[in-house]
């Protein structure tokens, strides 16, 4: 038990946030509810009824490759449900995980001075025509006309919109800079061949930040600051990322880096030097010379999923829209810009791809939709007398461990065996599964505790369970 406690206490820690109580239902399982009087019952969580693999997969567009572990698991478990090619319904478990991810992102962005905004998804064509990206983006840009014939696009990114906003402020001073403005919103891209579920879709969530500085030197400092925040984010999530030099593509600029999760199904080809810290997307390298440009050692090739991208833009956009500020000498000066993206839904899917087994979802500890699932005995079984104990344990956990209020599910499907419910809990990847089995009838009662992220199983008393769960931190 001591080893189990030590490992669980080592889980990433973040400040606990308050939670909304919507979604709680009156307790049907145990009549003696605590003051809050609510329990989260698994039977009330919305799940698609037709989760048989053949049925779910038949709903997919025939051009959509189902060769990706995360996509298969998310469909089979009921985390997502197909809507149309490249578009998915995000179901309750996924929404909870995504909201937690957004909270972690908010913490990291605001820790470096980021201010959250929300820009329209509809972007006027003239903004994109000014930068020539209306044509450069080609068919990937989703375009439409309103009833007056005015053209718009559904923005995949917002460099034009944010720069036009800053340009409209005519009395900006250097004393107000830097601005670090970011949003977490839906984005759209007309992918010719959507694939791999949330890894490459037509509609997705992205965090995009745009920075405005008073000088190239200050902009480079901001660039490093945001990159460090990205590193901190992925470290907190426990994801094995690599930062690589990258091409600027249609966004432009002079410096660019990608944050990649190395995995076999990744669409990006990476070159990593095992001797030094050099790493790059292979599209930036001369393929005829595959030695490290830093130490001349041989480069190792791998594949990766891009989950973040950073760009130092300079004055590429500010010069077009005349986004200026008044410098220390009182002269109008173009702002130095950067832009920074995180694929929110892609991070979720990529994390499942990297961390999960072939049959069971595994989450970054901070992002698990629920931290624990409690399984009472089957109705009519010899252990049914322990039902009251598991209800009391649920109430005690949610009252005595404030950060776990709203983080614990009670699997009240007591018509099913413990084994069947444990199998389901394993598939969903709750970090902790607590079972009232035969040993719950002992004096004192012992609960079977599965720690999914370490693979350990222990039999603990009520006090032992509390010692295990009290250090768990949520976001």
Curated annotation (Swiss-Prot):
**Keyword tags:** Aminoacyl-tRNA synthetase, ATP-binding, Disease variant, Epilepsy, Ligase, Mitochondrion, Nucleotide-binding, Protein biosynthesis, Transit peptide
Naming one, the record's GO cellular component terms include: mitochondrion
Question: What outcome is documented for mutating residue 95 to I in this protein?
Answer: In DEE75; uncertain significance
Biological-process GO terms, alphabetical: prolyl-tRNA aminoacylation
- What are the subcellular locations of this protein? Mitochondrion matrix
Q: Where is the signal peptide?
A: none
Q: What is its main location?
A: mitochondrion
The lineage's top-level taxon is Eukaryota
PROSITE patterns per the UniProt record, alphabetical: AA_TRNA_LIGASE_II
What are the recorded GO MF terms, alphabetically?
ATP binding; proline-tRNA ligase activity
Q: Does the keyword Nucleotide-binding apply?
A: yes
Q: Can you state which reaction this protein catalyses?
A: tRNA(Pro) + L-proline + ATP = L-prolyl-tRNA(Pro) + AMP + diphosphate
The top EC class, named as a word, is ligase
Q: Where does the transit peptide lie?
A: 1-29
InterPro entries in alphabetical order? aa-tRNA-synt_IIb, aa-tRNA-synth_II, aa-tRNA-synth_II/BPL/LPL, Anticodon-bd, Anticodon-bd_dom_sf, Pro-tRNA-ligase_IIa, Pro-tRNA_synthetase, ProRS_core_prok
Q: Does the keyword Electron transport apply?
A: no
List its EC numbers.
6.1.1.15
Disease field = Developmental and epileptic encephalopathy 75: A form of epileptic encephalopathy, a heterogeneous group of severe early-onset epilepsies characterized by refractory seizures, neurodevelopmental impairment, and poor prognosis. Development is normal prior to seizure onset, after which cognitive and motor delays become apparent. DEE75 is an autosomal recessive form characterized by onset of severe refractory seizures in the first months of life.
Its job: Mitochondrial aminoacyl-tRNA synthetase that catalyzes the specific attachment of the proline amino acid (aa) to the homologous transfer RNA (tRNA), further participating in protein synthesis. The reaction occurs in a two steps: proline is first activated by ATP to form Pro-AMP and then transferred to the acceptor end of tRNA(Pro).
Entry's family note: Belongs to the class-II aminoacyl-tRNA synthetase family.
PANTHER family in UniProt: MITOCHONDRIAL RIBOSOME PROTEIN L39/PROLYL-TRNA LIGASE FAMILY MEMBER (PTHR42753), PROLINE--TRNA LIGASE, MITOCHONDRIAL-RELATED (PTHR42753:SF10)
Protein name (database record)? Probable proline--tRNA ligase, mitochondrial
Q: Which gene encodes it?
A: PARS2
């Amino acid at each position: 038990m001591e080893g189990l406690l030590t490992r669980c206490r080592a889980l990433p820690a973040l400040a606990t946030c308050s939670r909304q109580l919507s979604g709680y239902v009156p307790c049907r399982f145990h009549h003696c509810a605590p003051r809050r009087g609510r329990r989260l019952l698994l039977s009330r969580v919305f799940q698609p009824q037709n989760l048989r693999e053949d049925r779910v997969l038949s709903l997919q567009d025939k051009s959509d490759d189902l060769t990706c572990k995360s996509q298969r698991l998310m469909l089979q478990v009921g985390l997502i449900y197909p809507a149309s090619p490249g578009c998915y319904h995000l179901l309750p478990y996924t929404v909870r995980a995504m909201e937690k991810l957004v909270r972690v992102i908010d913490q990291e962005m605001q820790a470096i001075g980021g201010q959250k905004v929300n820009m329209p998804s509809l972007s006027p064509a003239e903004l994109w025509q000014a930068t020539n990206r209306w044509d450069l983006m080609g068919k990937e840009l989703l375009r439409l006309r309103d009833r007056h014939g005015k053209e718009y696009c559904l923005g995949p990114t917002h460099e034009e919109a944010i720069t036009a906003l800053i340009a409209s402020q005519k009395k900006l001073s250097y004393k107000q800079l830097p601005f670090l403005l970011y949003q977490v919103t839906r984005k759209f891209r007309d992918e010719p061949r959507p694939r791999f579920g949330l890894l490459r879709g037509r509609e997705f969530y992205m965090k995009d930040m745009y920075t405005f500085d008073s000088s190239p030197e200050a902009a480079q400092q901001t660039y490093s600051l945001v990159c460090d925040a990205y590193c901190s984010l992925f470290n907190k999530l426990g994801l094995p990322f690599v930062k690589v030099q990258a091409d600027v593509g249609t966004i432009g600029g002079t410096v660019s880096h990608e944050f990649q999760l190395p995995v076999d199904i990744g669409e990006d080809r990476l070159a990593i030097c095992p001797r030094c810290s050099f790493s790059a997307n292979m599209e930036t390298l001369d393929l005829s010379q595959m030695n490290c440009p830093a130490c001349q050692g041989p480069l190792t090739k791998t594949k990766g999923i891009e989950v973040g991208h950073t760009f130092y833009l300079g004055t590429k956009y500010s010069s077009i829209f005349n986004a200026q500020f008044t410098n220390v000498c009182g002269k109008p000066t173009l702002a130095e810009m950067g832009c920074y993206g995180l694929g929110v839904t892609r991070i979720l899917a990529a994390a499942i791809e990297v961390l999960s087994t072939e049959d069971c979802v595994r989450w970054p500890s901070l992002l698990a939709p629920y931290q624990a699932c409690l399984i009472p005995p089957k109705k009519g079984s010899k252990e049914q007398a322990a039902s009251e104990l598991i209800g009391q344990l649920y109430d005690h956990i949610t009252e005595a461990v404030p950060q776990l209020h709203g983080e614990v599910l009670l699997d009240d499907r007591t018509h099913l065996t413990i084994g069947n419910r444990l199998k389901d809990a394993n598939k969903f990847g709750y970090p902790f599964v607590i079972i009232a089995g035969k040993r719950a009838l002992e004096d004192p009662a012992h609960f079977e505790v599965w720690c999914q992220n370490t693979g350990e199983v222990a039999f603990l008393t009520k006090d032992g369970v509390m010692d295990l769960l009290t250090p768990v931190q949520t976001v």
